[in-house]
Amino acid sequence: MKILVIGSGGREHALAWKIAQSARVSEVLVAPGNAGTATEAKCRNVAIKVDDLDGLLALAQREAVALTVVGPEVPLVLGVVDRFHAAGLRIFGPTAKAAQLEGSKAFAKDFLARHGIPTAYYAVHTEVDAALAYVREKGTPIVVKADGLAAGKGVIVALTLAEAEDAVRDMLSGNAFGDAGARVVIEEFLDGEEASFISMVDGKHALPMATSQDHKRVGDGDTGPNTGGMGAYSPAPVVTPEVHARVMREVVEPTVQGMIADGVPFTGFLYAGLMIDAHGAPKVIEFNVRFGDPETQPVMLRLQSDLVDLLEAAIDGKLDGAHAQWDPRPSLGVVIAARPYPDTPVTGEVIAGLDAVPASAKVFHAGTALNAAGEVVSAGGRVLCVAALGDSVQDAQRTAYAGLKPIHWSSAFQRSDIGWRAIARERQAQG
């Protein structure tokens, strides 16, 4: 069978790589893909943009694609699933209405409140003066979020009143995020440890994937501005078996049932960005309606089941009978980005050393392309993610960083401490 993966990032390379391992798959089409998917076994890039729904639909029909997997949020919010369904094609992802869980933070917060799912207190504002008054009343630290899609960057954690006021003004009157910032959600700052809890959902049932923890800040020690994510590891030790049970009971199940109750059943990858407090109580920071990036890369390294079998079960509404097998070893992925990311990065630089990466690490491509000479060049902010398995998180970290050592181009940089929380825990446990 032929499978289509929509997207061009590290997440899509990891999904295509895992899908290509299935004996049931003859070819994986990736639209538009990157330099990694261009050379991955059984994969072929097709130059169609993720927001070209007509082109994607025509491709799936022309190539007799058996099923389509959507990587990024943009085509989901635009309604790619609705278009494919209308044409009678099999596709895994939420409808445009269900994708509002990510497409609008106000929609998500109202949904959480309506269904009694734990989250931070919040208010939605469209007027600068009212928003500023609310911020002054609540005090800091406080979180200001652009309502719409902002590629993971429309969130300001304000530690001072001046920062909060600047964020409100930037988003509402300065138009820092265009239409995405025409409304802002202002919410309480949550204390605790973050975890990414991703489930496959078939409309009625949820099958949890391995947990993971992302590193959002650009700098070591979680400093500097937020990014789309600088690295991740799986599993997240903060999600103990007890916390896992609570998340399923208090967050995932009520979300699946709540979407049914609202007449918008959810099918797809449901990503709950959680804050776990000192007592193990989870609160939802945000929903994404697709697999995380860079979490997908280490999570796919650990998945031992045939992903195609799971996708088929999800599309057929049969996840209650499905089971996912995981490598017990932890995995860790480090993003190599291009300066000055998260500001507009330098692109078009030739990436050297990819052929010298040891077999113990897997390089997933994100913002890469092939130039006219067939060389791999940088083409985005987050360029590569080097991932590895290990007997411990520290071991996986060591192998991943050894794996990225030969890779270089002049604007390249990465954090040196991905996995630091889990490694501190491991050291503590060893006494």
UniProtKB/Swiss-Prot annotation:
Reactions this protein catalyses: 5-phospho-beta-D-ribosylamine + glycine + ATP = N(1)-(5-phospho-beta-D-ribosyl)glycinamide + ADP + phosphate + H(+)
EC number from the UniProt entry: 6.3.4.13
Cofactor(s) listed in the protein's UniProt record: Mg(2+); Mn(2+)
Binding site for ATP: 135-196
GO molecular function, one term: phosphoribosylamine-glycine ligase activity
Family matches, as InterPro entries: ATP-grasp (IPR011761), ATP_grasp_subdomain_1 (IPR013815), PreATP-grasp_dom_sf (IPR016185), PRibGlycinamid_synth_ATP-grasp (IPR020561), PRibGlycinamide_synth (IPR000115), PRibGlycinamide_synth_C-dom (IPR020560), PRibGlycinamide_synth_C_sf (IPR037123), PRibGlycinamide_synth_CS (IPR020559)
Pfam families to which the protein is assigned, alphabetical: GARS_A, GARS_C, GARS_N
Domain ATP-grasp: 109-316
GO biological process: 'de novo' IMP biosynthetic process; purine nucleobase biosynthetic process
Binding site for Mg(2+): E286, N288
Cofactor binding annotation: Binds 1 Mg(2+) or Mn(2+) ion per subunit.
Pathway the protein contributes to: Purine metabolism; IMP biosynthesis via de novo pathway; N(1)-(5-phospho-D-ribosyl)glycinamide from 5-phospho-alpha-D-ribose 1-diphosphate: step 2/2
Keywords: ATP-binding, Ligase, Magnesium, Manganese, Metal-binding, Nucleotide-binding, Purine biosynthesis
Enzyme class: ligase
UniProt family annotation: Belongs to the GARS family.
Protein name per UniProt: Phosphoribosylamine--glycine ligase
Gene name in the database record: purD
